[in-house]
Amino acid sequence: MLTGKTIVLGVTGGIAAYKSANLASMLIKLHADVHVIMTQNATKFITPMTFETLTNNKCIVDTFDRNFSFDVKHVSLAKRGDLFIVAPCTANVIGKLAHGICDDMLTTTMLATRAPKLIAPAMNTGMWENPILQDNLTKLKGYGYHIIDPIIGRLACGDTGTGKMNSEEVIVEHILSFMAKEHDLAGKHYLISAGPTQEAIDPVRYITNHSSGKMGYAIAKMARLRGAKVTLVSGPVNIKPFCGVDLVPVKSAADMFQAVTSRSAEADVVIMCSAVADYTPAVYADQKVKKHDGDLQIELKRTQDILGWLGEHKPANQTLVGFSMETENLIENSRAKLLKKHADLICANSIAGGNTGFAVDTNKVTLISSQEVKELPLCSKEETADLILSHIQTLA
């Protein structure tokens, strides 16, 4: 995803510096060209050789180091870097950056660059909550810095509180959101639903389906990478949303209906990728239903048709996309759904093969609109999501 991109990683003098080695490794695996600049204090926690081995580039510490080919390094890297990330970033370096102090290679290069700048603070809770530190962060945000907030965790001092550097995975997601894709969806709001619903029978049991949510979450991720504002209404799944995605968790079909319909009017594109239950128990038992010798009969009633409601109340210029999953007559049934629900596009899934449908990481989708039927190749769900989003662009 980062092929051809140059990332400058700044490492400052905190205990979280050891995590920066893994961060550099993760960026290398995404095919980025990574250059590391360390403060002198950072070398007390991890050696420059570690980063040089991982990145195959010289790690720079000393502004006046003569042991490299002649160019003005702080200007050279400032021009070459497509993105700068300082992780961890100490309170000391935050203060320097906020006030334009350039007393080492890292702060000098950061001031010289015009590339996007991200910082991942890491420090004691008392330092993080100090008004001076928060003032400096406000200044940096005003200067265009993007702050990856620390999380609650066990700190070097033994305390538990806010100040632990965010995970390397989250930091990589923030980097990807800046540079992995062209932001051709910037300014658009995508409302996406994903996952199954759970229809409670009693406090212990519920009716659900096999949906893993992987397809919906992949669409949300790719839309975010392409610059869209994304709201994801999700049933119960075991997936973390991509950074920057606004997650709205729900359980039942009724919850899903309320969450989606109350937000649909403000969306440019609505994608109903969730597997919403068609039926729900007519009566909910407040106490656990006890087993007995005879059979148990549960009366079911229809749930509200979310896609149908969206089609009937669709604002002008909104694009409505639905999903269908069939075991037979895929095209015919999906085309009928397109017309009945007043949708602009149906993404038709067949679960006849073993590499498509629920839980797996690949999918094969047929796109059905009033103009055409387009069969997509079998590929990963993220690649499928990207192709779906590109096709939606042609409908707008």
Model-found features: residue ranges?
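A cross-family phosphate/adenosyl-ligand binding-site feature
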Residues: 1-118, 124-213, 217-396
